[in-house]
């Protein structure tokens, strides 16, 4: 661009014209630089550099985040001296709002296709499910006629309005159960990660449904709503049982005999069910107390269910078994065996309750409320595909995953989070405690947090490989961990780029 000579006296119109052209050219240059950041310097689809994007604003870009295809950028307010104001982090969506049609489509996809579809299944999935849906359509239609026929066979008149009402009520009850089964199927991914916990929770629901069914005897005028509620609960339990059955049988099979193992397992269950039916017929002749009988049978059912899932030995590490393994390693230097790890796994925890002290794959807004904390922690993880931090207000350790994180990075992030939790517990009272005992009131200073993170980084660099090798020696399949991380991924933007 030619230099502008200030001593040259041009006519006013010429000076104004030159100024306009110069201003327009500079505006276009700045706009182009903002719209097209250098590909080699910035991550793909990265937002514009913070200094240029907020040139005349106190807001500064910290990082960007992607979750389920939606992208967000996080900004914080500067106080003018280069420091950030506390609790000034704000999330700005980079996506236009979804139309109602798109929202309905996303809602339906979350129920009828697996996560990651179509990449998570092979090409035969779609034709199989298409024909399966058609089969169930005809089966559902046939069910109405079979129900009416059965009711007529036991004495209900075909032309009676009462029999028609009974048939409709019965069909509505079954329909409500199918709706409940469909709604709970959205939790399908959790069946892979926490199958023991979900299996036991399903058995609890089964007994709850049985109790609601028995309650219809006390309030017969509420038969339909109670029967519908009971059928919903019992169908949810049935989904849980069906979805967790195959992984459990797979753990027993040593070769390509999973079909045989499954068939024999179901046969054992059916034989025991028939024996239980015969037993109930015998004792029902004596007219025992309904409440007492239900209480005793339910206790036996739930105790057997608990011991059933507790006896399963799985070779993979979900969050519960991973916690057992890491805690043992940090305290004793050894990784528990498969039998020990599975026995110590907690069954009375429900995957949909987020009360764990370690949050894996968390969102940025949950992990960081103070932007200065993020800027202080970030340099420790520049060479990693994750980062960990501790939130004193929530009493939890958060592991955030970067966009390129693979399965080993997720495993390492989870290990690092537990190590940091171990150090935070030590800083509180000098004695390492269980991860379930973290005190939310403990609020370390920023310097203390940096010190603990530095210590954890040093320990992870020397002990993570040792942990993996010792876990593999015990038979744990480290390459098939089921840690169920959150779907949020960070895309970092460095200041000044």
Swiss-Prot record:
This is Protein root UVB sensitive 6. PANTHER family: PROTEIN ROOT UVB SENSITIVE 6 (PTHR12770:SF20), RUS1 FAMILY PROTEIN C16ORF58 (PTHR12770). Belongs to the RUS1 family. It comes from Arabidopsis thaliana. The lineage of its organism: Eukaryota, Viridiplantae, Streptophyta, Embryophyta, Tracheophyta. Required for normal embryo development. Pfam families: RUS6_N (PF24162), UVB_sens_C (PF24160), UVB_sens_prot (PF04884). It comes from the Eukaryota. Coiled coil: none annotated.
């Amino acid at each position: 661009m030619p230099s502008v000579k200030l001593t040259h006296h041009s006519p006013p119109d010429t000076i104004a014209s030159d100024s306009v052209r110069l201003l327009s050219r500079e505006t276009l240059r700045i706009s182009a630089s903002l719209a097209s950041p250098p590909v080699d310097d910035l991550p793909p689809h990265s937002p514009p550099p913070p200094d240029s994007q907020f040139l005349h604003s106190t807001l500064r870009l910290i990082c960007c985040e992607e979750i389920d295809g939606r992208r967000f950028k996080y900004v914080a307010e500067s106080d003018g001296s280069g420091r950030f104001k506390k609790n000034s982090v704000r999330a700005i969506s980079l996506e236009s709002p979804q139309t109602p049609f798109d929202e309905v489509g996303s809602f339906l996809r979350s129920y009828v296709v697996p996560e990651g579809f179509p990449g998570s299944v092979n090409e035969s999935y779609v034709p199989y499910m298409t024909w399966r849906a058609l089969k169930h359509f005809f089966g559902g239609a046939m069910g109405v006629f079979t129900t009416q026929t059965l009711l007529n066979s036991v004495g209900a008149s075909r032309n009676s309005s009462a029999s028609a009402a009974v048939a409709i009520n019965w069909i509505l009850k079954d329909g409500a159960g199918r709706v409940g089964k469909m709604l709970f199927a959205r939790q399908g991914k959790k069946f892979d990660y926490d199958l023991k916990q979900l299996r036991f929770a399903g058995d609890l629901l089964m007994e709850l449904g049985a109790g609601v069914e028995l309650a219809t005897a006390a309030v017969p005028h509420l038969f339909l709503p109670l029967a519908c509620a009971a059928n919903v609960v019992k169908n949810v339990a049935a989904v849980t049982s069906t979805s967790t059955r195959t992984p459990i049988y797979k753990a027993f099979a040593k070769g390509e005999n999973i079909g045989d193992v499954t068939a024999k397992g179901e046969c054992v269950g059916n034989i025991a069910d028939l024996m239980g039916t015969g037993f109930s017929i015998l004792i029902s002749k004596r007219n025992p107390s309904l409440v007492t009988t239900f209480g005793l049978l339910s206790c036996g059912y739930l105790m057997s269910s608990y011991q059933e899932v507790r006896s399963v030995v799985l070779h993979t590490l979900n969050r519960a078994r991973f916690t057992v393994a890491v805690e043992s390693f940090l305290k004793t230097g050894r990784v528990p065996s498969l039998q020990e790890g599975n026995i110590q796994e907690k069954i009375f925890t429900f995957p949909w309750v987020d009360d764990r002290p370690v949050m894996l794959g968390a969102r940025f807004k949950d992990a960081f409320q103070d932007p200065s904390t993020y800027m202080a922690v970030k340099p420790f993880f520049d060479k990693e595909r994750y980062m960990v931090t501790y939130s004193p207000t929530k009493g939890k350790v958060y592991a955030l995953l970067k966009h390129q994180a693979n399965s080993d990075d997720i495993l390492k992030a989870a290990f690092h989070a537990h190590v940091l939790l171990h150090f935070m517990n030590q800083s509180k009272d000098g004695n390492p405690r269980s991860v379930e005992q973290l005190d939310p009131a403990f609020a370390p200073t920023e310097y203390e947090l940096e010190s603990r993170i530095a210590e954890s980084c040093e320990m992870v660099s020397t002990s993570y490989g040792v942990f993996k090798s010792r876990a593999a020696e015990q038979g744990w399949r480290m390459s098939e961990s089921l840690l169920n991380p959150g779907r949020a991924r960070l895309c970092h933007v460095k200041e000044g780029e």
